[in-house]
Amino acid sequence: MSNKKKQLTVMGTVWDFWSVLKMFDKLYESKYISFYEPWLKGEIDKEKIILFNEKSKNPLLWPFKILKRTYKILKIIREFKPDLVITHHDDANVSIIPVILLNKIFKISNNTKFILWVRNNPIESYKEGLYSKIIILAYKYFYKYADIIIVQTQENKKIIESHFKSLKNKTKIVPNVYEIDKLQQLSNEPLEKQYRNIFKDSFVFINIGRLTEQKGQWFLIRSFKRVTEKYPNAKLIILGDGELKNKLQELINKLNLQNNVYLLGMQKNPFKFLKHSNCFVFSSLWEGLPNTVIEALSLNLPVISTDCKTGPREILCPELNISDKIDYPYYGKYGILTKPFSREFIWQDLNEKPLIEEEKMLADLMIKMIEDEDLRKRYSNGLERAKDFDIEKIIKEWKLLIEGTI
C-alpha cells in the first residue's frame, strides 16, 4: 500500500458516530457530508464537514431530496475522487444508490469504492408506509451494487442475508465503537440540583432511548406500576424525547406514577444519570446494536433487557448462540434477558387491561433486583464486556476492512 493517505468521504447524520469520525480523521484524508446540522464538537476541522443542512423532514419530499442529494454528491465525488465512500443509516444508504449506479455508467470516479453501514434490523424497522417500502426495495434490488454492507451483530447479518439473498457475500460485521474512558469521565460530572431528590433514598431504574414505538417504554411503565405496589419509593427515569412523549406522560398520570416515573427528556450527558442509578432496564421491541446497553455496562450498572432482535443477547450473553432456544428469564454472563414484547400498543389503565405475561416478568425481575444484593453484585461486572467495544479495539477492525477494500 502507498504511504499516501487514502481519501474517504463519510455521509449521513454524522453526529451519530462522532467517535468513528475522529478515528477516520486520524487515519485518512476525510470529508464528512451531513444532511442535517451536526453537533459540532470542535474536534474535527469544520472545513472538512460539508453540510447539506436540510430543514424539512417531510417524507413526501423525500424523493426530491434524493434527487438533490444525488446531484450534490456526484459533484463532490467528481471533485475529490475519494478512494472510499461510507454511508451511515439507511437514509444515507438509499441516497447513495443512484450515485453508485451513475458512477458505474459514466465512470465519474473509477476507483471509488462504496460501503453502506446498516444500523438497524430492516425487517422490523420498515414494516409500514411508502418510505419503508422504498428502503426494503433498496435492500432487495440495489444494495448489492455497493462493495460492502456493514452490520453490527451476527443476528442482523443472518436476518439480512436470509431475506436478501443478493447480499449474502457482501455483509461484514463491525460493532459500534465507544470511548469507554471518556464515558466514565463524563459520568463523574455532578447532577443538576433539580434532579438530585429523585435519587435520594430511592432505588432508581433508568431507561435511555427515543420515545418511539421501537423503544417500548409503555410496557416498561406499566410493568413499573407493579414494582411500586411493593416498593412505593422506587423510581424510574427515562431519558429521551420523541413522538410518544405526551402519550407516555398520559399513561404515567393514569397509573398515578407521577412521583415514581420521570420523563427527563434529552440530556447532553446521560452518563451522570447512569452512574447515580441502580439498574438499567431496556424495553426495546427491536434494535441493531443498542448503544445504551453497552454504555450502562461501561459503568458497571446491572442490566435487564428484552431479548429483542438484535443486539441485547450478543452483548449480554456471549455464551449463547443467536439461534439457541432459552427459557425466560435468562441469567446471562453480563445481564438478564427477559421475554421480548410484541408490537402492541397498550395505553389503557391497568384496571382496564391487566398486565400481560411479559410485563409481569419484567416487573418481577426489577423487584428481584431491588431485593437481591448478591444479584446486583453479580451484574456489576459490565465494564469487562464493554471493553470489547472500546474504540481502541474496533478501530483495528475498521482499518483492516478499509485497507482490504481500497
Swiss-Prot record:
CDD domains listed in its UniProt record: GT4_GT28_WabH-like
Alphabetized UniProt keyword annotations: Glycosyltransferase, Transferase
Disulfide bridge map: none
Entry GO MF terms: glycosyltransferase activity
First-level EC class: transferase
Listed EC numbers: 2.4.-.-
Top-level lineage group: Archaea
Tagged with keyword Phosphoprotein: no
Record-linked InterPro entries: Glyco_trans_1 (IPR001296)
Pfam families cross-referenced by the UniProt entry: Glycos_transf_1
Family: Belongs to the glycosyltransferase group 1 family. Glycosyltransferase 4 subfamily.
Protein name: Uncharacterized glycosyltransferase MJ1059
Species the sequence originates in: Methanocaldococcus jannaschii (strain ATCC 43067 / DSM 2661 / JAL-1 / JCM 10045 / NBRC 100440) (Methanococcus jannaschii)
